[in-house]
Amino acid sequence: MEPNSLQWVGSPCGLHGPYIFYKAFQFHLEGKPRILSLGDFFFVRCTPKDPICIAELQLLWEERTSRQLLSSSKLYFLPEDTPQGRNSDHGEDEVIAVSEKVIVKLEDLVKWVHSDFSKWRCGLQAGSVKTESLGRNGQKEALLKYRQSTLNSGLNFKDVLKEKADLDCLGEDEEETNVIVLSYPQYCRYRSMLKRIQDKPSSILTDQFALALGGIAVVSKNPQILYCRDTFDHPTLIENESICDEFAPNLKGRPRKKKPCPQRRDSFSGGKDPNNNSDGKSVAKVKCEARSALNKPKNNHNNCKKVSNEEKPKVAIGEECRADEQAFLVALYKYMKERKTPIERIPYLGFKQINLWTMFQAAQKLGGYETITARRQWKHIYDELGGNPGSTSAATCTRRHYERLILPYERFIKGEEDKPLPPIKPRKQENNSQENENKTKVSGAKRIKHEISKSKKEKENAPKPQDASEVSSEQEKEQETVNQKSITEPLPIADTKKKLEGYQDFAARPLVSQADPEKDSETDQGANSEKVAEEAGEKGPAPPLASAPLAPTPGTGKQSLTSPSALVDSKEPKPCCFTESPENELQEASFPGFSTTQPPLANQSEVEDDKLPAMADYIANCTVKVDQLGSDDIHNALKQTPKVLVVQSFDMFKDKDLTGPMNENHGLNYTPLLYSRGNPGIMSPLAKKKLLSQVSGASLSSSYPYGSPPPLISKKKVIAREDRCSSLSQAHHGQSTDHMAVNRPSVIQHVQSFRSKPSEERKISDIFKHDKLSRSEPRFSFSKHHLSPSKKSRGRRTVEKRALPHSHMPSFLADFYSSPHLHSLYRHTEHHLHNEQTSKYPCRDMYRETENSSFPSHKHQEKLHVNYLASLHLQDKKSAAVEAPTDDQPTDLSLPKNPHKPTGKALGLAHSAPGPQESKGTSQFQVINSQSRDCHPKACRVSPMTMSAPKKYPEALSRSGKPHPVRLENFRKMDSMVHPILHRKMSPQNIGAARPIKRSLEDLDLVIAGKKARAVSPLDPAKEVSGKEKASEQESEGSKAAHSGHSGGTSEGHKLPLSSPIFPGLYSGSLCSSGLNSRLPAGYSHSLQYLKNQAVLSPLMQPLAFHSLVMQRGIFTSPTNSQQLYRHLAAATPVGSSYGDLLHNSIYPLAAINPQAAFPSSQLSSVHPSTKL
C-alpha cells in the first residue's frame, strides 16, 4: 500500500508533550478502505512465519518531533501458540495475552494486517444482530454509542463512527472477520445472558437491560467471542524488527517522588524521552529478559551520558559551586541585615529546609521572580528544592519564602531596589501566626480601623522579632508598637515604655490575683492595653480599653470583669502615659479653660481609674468618639485622626495623638462600652444613628452622647497614678496630665476613673478617703477647668473617677451628678419626681428632671462634679455634716437616705467591697456618669444635686453650689431612683447614654432644642455649669460628703443602692433618658424588672442605677463590662449580691439592661449587654 494511504480519522483526542493522540486511522486493505479505531480487535500476523493472533488497538499517536505515526497494541494468542501450549485448564474460547504491549509504526501494523485469516476457527460464534432491523429502529447507533462509551473511556467517537458508517454505505464490510476478546467475567456474563435469551431473537441483545447485564450486541456478520484471563511472555516477539519500543510515549504525570533533576529534565526533553525512559518503560512493558536486556543498554547508554554530564557539574559544584554558594550566602545575609530584614532562620519547605543557594539558582535559570510568577513556575522551584511532592500549596509557599528571603537581594543585584516588593503579609502571618493570633487576642480593639492599621504597622515593625519571639516577646513587640505609635503620637517612647512596663506589672498582678482563669487573657490584655497605651500615648488608658472594648474578652472586658485591680494597675501606668503623653497637651489645648494644676492629679487618678475598669475606659472611649463628633473638646482631642464614632474611639486610642486620645479615652471609652460587649467596635446601623444623634446633640462642650461626663478622676486615683506615673508623667505630667484632665476631663477622667477603680478596689476605704482628699484638690482644679465647658467635662470626669474609688456605684452617681448645678437639678428633679411619682417611680421622673437639668448644667456639672467629688473626699470626713444638708433637700422616697451618712464608709466599702468587680463596674458607671454629666439629662432638673457615685455625688453637690442637704437629697433621690429605674423618659441624655436610642436621639435633639436641652447640650450647659460650678463647688464639697455618705449608705443598705442611682439612667428611663439620672435607681429598682419594666420600681431588687452615660457608654453592651459593673455594684452595696448575682437576679436582666419601656429601648438595646449577661 502507498504510504500516503495512512491517515488519521477524526480529531485528535489528546496532547501530551510531543505527542498528539488520535482515535482511529484509515488504511487500505486489499484496495478497500478500512478504519481501525481504539478498542478494535483485528487479526494480525507479526511475521509470515508467526501464528495468527488477535491485536487490540489501544493507543494511536503521532510524535511531532520525528513525525512518526505510532500505535500500541495488545496481542492475544491461542494457548497452543504459546510456549506452554494448551492444557486442560484452558477454555475452548480462551486466548492468552502477551504481557507487554507492542509499539509498532502504523505502516508496519498495516503490513501485519495484510494476511489471510480465513483459517481462524476459534471463538464463540455469536449470533449477529441484523443491521436491517437495527437500522429501522435506530438501535445501531445506540449500540455503537454504548460500545464506544463503555469500551473507549468515554471518548467521543462520533466522527469515527460517522466515517465507519460512510464506509458501510459504500458496501465495504470491514468487520467481516470481526472478533472480540472479553475478560473472563464479561465472558461468563455474556454466556449467562445468551442462555437466558436463547429462545428469543438476537435483537433483544440490543436492549439496554440485556446490555447492562452483560449482553453483547455484535453487528458484524461473523462475530467471534473469546476471553482472556492470563498472560505470558513471548520469547521471540522482542526480536521482531517492526516492534519499536524506543518510541513508547512517556505518559507519566508529575513525579510522585523526587527524581534527580537531570533525569526529570531528560524525561521532558522531547524526541529521546521515550528512549531515556524506555528503561523504566521496558521493565513495565516488556517482561522478557531479552527485551529488558535490549532496552537496558539503551537506557544505560543514555544514563551514562547523563551521568557524564552531571558528574562534571557535580565536581564543579563540589568545588566551584561551594565557593559560589558561600559567597552568595554571605552577600545575601549581609544585604538583608543592612536593609533591616535579617534572615534569622531558614524556613522549612516540604519538610526540608530550604537551600537558599539552590532556590536562587533555580529561580535565575527560569528567568527570575517576575518571569516565574508570570509563568506560574514556582512549583518547579519547589521541585528543585526537593520538597515533599504531596504539598498542595507548594507554589505559593515557595514564592512567599522567595519574596521574603531572596527577592530583595535579587532586586538589589539587578539594580531594581526601587521596584516595590510584593506584599509579604501572608509570609509574615505564616511565620508569626501564633504571635499574630496572640496579638489579635491581646488587642481586641484592633478591630477598629485605626487599631487595625496600627496592628498592621506593629506587625510590619515587629514581624521579624515575632518570627522567633515568644508570646512575651509578642507582648513586648506590642508594647514596642505601642511605643512606636506613641512616638508617632505626642507621647514619648520612653515614657510609653515605662508606662507599658508599669501597666504590664500592674495588670499582671491584679489579673493574676483576681482571676486566675482570666489571668493569661488579662495579661495579654494588659500587654495589649500597654500596647495600645503606648500606641495612643495619652490614649494609653483608653487604647487598652479601646482594644478591650473592641474585643472585650481579650482585653478591657476581661480586665474590667476579671480584675478591677488589674485594670487599675494596668491603667494606672497608662494614666502615667496619659499624663506624659502630648495628648494631655492636646487636651489642654483643646480645653484651655481647664487648669493644669489640678488636671495632673486628676489625670493620674483618671489614668488609674481608666486602668481599673477597662470597660469604663471603653465607655469613655465611646463617649470621646461621640464627643469628638459632638463636642469641640473631644473633637480637638480626636481631630488628629477622627473616624467613625465607635471605630474612631479605638482608632483614636491608637492613632490619635497620645494627649488627644487620653482625653478622648474617657469619652471614647464610653462609646466603646456602649458597643463593647456585644459588638466590640461594631455598631448596628440603629446604634450608629443614635450615637450620631447623640454626638450631634453633644456637639456642644457637653454634647457627649451622655453629656460631657463629669471628671471621673478620683484624687486618690490621681494621687496613686501620680505616685506610679509621677516619674514618667512628671515631664509630661504638668502639661499632659493637666491638659488631659483639663482638656478632656469628662472623657478621660471617666475612663481613668474606671481604670483606677481596680486599684481603688484594693484599697477602697483608704482610696475612698484619699479620693475625697484628692478630689477636693481636683475639684478645684476641675472647677477651674469646668469654667470652660471642656474643662468642666474633664474636671468632672476626673472628679468622677476620683469619686469612683469611694463608691463605685455611688461614685458613678456622683460622676453623673458631679456638678453642683446638675446635682441640685437632680435633687430638684428627684424631689419633684419623688413627690409626683413617689408612689410609682419618683426616681424615674427625678432622673428625667435630673437629666434635663443635668445637660444644661453639664459644664457646670463637670466643675460641680469635680467639686462634688472633692466634697465627697472631704465629706468622707464630713459625711455626717453633709448628710444633714442632703436631708434638708426634698428627698426622693425612691432614694435611700442612709447612704448620706455612710458616704465615706459606704463609699469606701462600696469601693472595697465591690473590689475589682464593683470598682470596675463603678468605674464604668462613673465613666458613663461623667459622660452623662456632660449631657446629664437626669440630673438637669435637680441641678444642684448631680447624682454620681456617692463621692462624686457629694462633689457634684458641692460643685452644684447647692447645699449639701440638697445634694444628699438628690443622692437619696438618686438612690430611690435606683430602686425605681423608670427615668428613661428623661433620656435626652440617654441618647448619650450607653446606647443611642431613638428616644435618646430625640431627647438629645430636644436637649439641643432646649426642651431637655439642659442635659442634652453638655457644651452650653457646661458653660452654664462652669459659672454654676464655681458657686456650687462649695456646695459640692458639702454635699459631696453628704452624698458620699448617702451613696455609702445606699451601698450598705442596698446591694446596689449606690449603684442603683448610678444605673437607673443606664437601665430605665434614666439609663436611656437621663444621663444624670442614671445614678438614681429610677429604672433600676429591680435589676431585671426595672430593666424590663422601667415603670416597675422594685425595692426588692437593689436599685442598680446605671447612669445613662454608663448605658450609653455601652457598659452594659459588653457582657464583660456589664457583669463587672454589676459585680461592682453588688460589691459596693452591702446588699451583698455580686455583679453576677445581680445579673443572675435580674438586677441587670437583658430586658432590664435595655429598659426601653420608660425610655426608647433602642438606647439601652444598643448599649446593654443583655444578651451577654
Swiss-Prot record:
BP GO annotations: adipose tissue development; positive regulation of DNA-binding transcription factor activity; regulation of transcription by RNA polymerase II
UniProt biased composition (Basic and acidic residues): 450-462, 1021-1040
Modification after translation, per record: Methylation at Lys-340 prevents DNA-binding. Demethylation by PHF2 promotes recruitment of the PHF2-ARID5B complex to promoters.
UniProt biased composition (Low complexity): 547-557
Coiled coil: none
Organism lineage string: Eukaryota, Metazoa, Chordata, Craniata, Vertebrata
Full protein name: AT-rich interactive domain-containing protein 5B
Residue numbers bearing the N6,N6-dimethyllysine modification: K340
Matching Gene3D superfamilies: ARID DNA-binding domain
GO function terms (MF aspect): transcription cis-regulatory region binding; transcription coactivator activity
